[in-house]
């Protein structure tokens, strides 16, 4: 049987070229699965007749890991926020308003945070879980809101389909693990919150 000569190593397979390609890849932006947008709402005393959300502003839309860390480190930490302010991270194209089509039939899981360090840690863990697509029901999630208030801070995870109890409970359980929260977490419908006397007990809990 005739011997078959081994094919010469292609230039692209040499250690030098592979190392150069690896170094270039390490410097390249790390793309996320989808685009996200940071929003903020610095609330002053509203003018008579002003509609809710008039102070809400979109700050930046991003789709790389590097952009996320730059925005978070420089701006979007709760410790950098004054009282009566909100930070939002929502999927690009979704506004953090009840009226948005993606949010209109949804609701939110809410977690109270008694200390700034707790809020900051929970906020960061939630942000990383969202942009890292750690939720099995990630298509159901709209975004998250960090609210800094004198009477107590809180986080709220907004979802799309409030009536789907099984999906919302799964999301709530996963979020509870992510933020390492041990007390009861409640879910409320946006429709309930629009009423003059919304239910304080929530629709679901985990």
Curated annotation (Swiss-Prot):
Keywords, sorted A to Z: Disulfide bond, Initiation factor, Protein biosynthesis, RNA-binding, Translation regulation
Gene3D superfamilies: RNA Cap, Translation Initiation Factor Eif4e
Pfam families in the record: IF4E
An MF annotation (GO) of this entry: translation initiation factor activity
Disulfide bonds: 103-142
Any GO BP annotation: regulation of translation
PTM entry text: According to the redox status, the Cys-103-Cys-142 disulfide bridge may have a role in regulating protein function by affecting its ability to bind capped mRNA.
InterPro entries: TIF_eIF4e-like (IPR023398), TIF_eIF_4E (IPR001040), TIF_eIF_4E_CS (IPR019770)
GO cellular component: eukaryotic translation initiation factor 4F complex
PANTHER family hit by this protein: EUKARYOTIC TRANSLATION INITIATION FACTOR 4E RELATED (PTHR11960), EUKARYOTIC TRANSLATION INITIATION FACTOR ISOFORM 4E-2 (PTHR11960:SF60)
Entry's family note: Belongs to the eukaryotic initiation factor 4E family.
Subunit structure: EIF4F is a multi-subunit complex, the composition of which varies with external and internal environmental conditions. It is composed of at least EIF4A, EIF4E and EIF4G. EIF4E is also known to interact with other partners. In higher plants two isoforms of EIF4F have been identified, named isoform EIF4F and isoform EIF(iso)4F. Isoform EIF4F has subunits p220 and p26, whereas isoform EIF(iso)4F has subunits p82 and p28.
Cited function: Recognizes and binds the 7-methylguanosine-containing mRNA cap during an early step in the initiation of protein synthesis and facilitates ribosome binding by inducing the unwinding of the mRNAs secondary structures.
Protein name (record): Eukaryotic translation initiation factor isoform 4E-2
Naturally occurring in which organism (per UniProt): Oryza sativa subsp. japonica (Rice)
């Amino acid at each position: 049987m005739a011997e078959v000569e081994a094919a010469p190593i292609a230039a692209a397979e040499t250690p030098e070229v592979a190392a150069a390609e690896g170094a270039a890849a390490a410097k390249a932006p790390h793309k996320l699965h989808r685009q996200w947008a940071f929003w903020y709402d610095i609330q002053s005393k509203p003018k008579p007749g002003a509609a809710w959300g008039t102070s809400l502003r979109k700050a930046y839309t991003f789709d790389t890991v590097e952009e996320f860390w730059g925005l978070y480190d420089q701006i979007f930490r709760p410790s950098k926020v004054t009282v009566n302010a909100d930070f939002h991270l929502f999927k690009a194209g979704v506004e953090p308003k009840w009226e948005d089509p993606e949010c209109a039939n949804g609701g939110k899981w809410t977690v109270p945070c008694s200390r700034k360090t707790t809020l900051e840690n929970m906020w960061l863990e939630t942000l990383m879980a969202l942009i890292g697509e750690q939720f099995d029901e990630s298509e159901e999630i709209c975004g998250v809101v960090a609210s800094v208030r004198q009477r107590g801070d809180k986080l709220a995870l907004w979802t799309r389909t409030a009536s789907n109890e099984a999906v919302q409970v799964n999301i709530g359980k996963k979020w509870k693990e992510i933020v390492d929260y041990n007390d009861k977490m409640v879910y409320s419908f946006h429709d309930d919150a629009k009423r003059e006397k919304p239910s304080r007990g929530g629709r679901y809990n985990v």
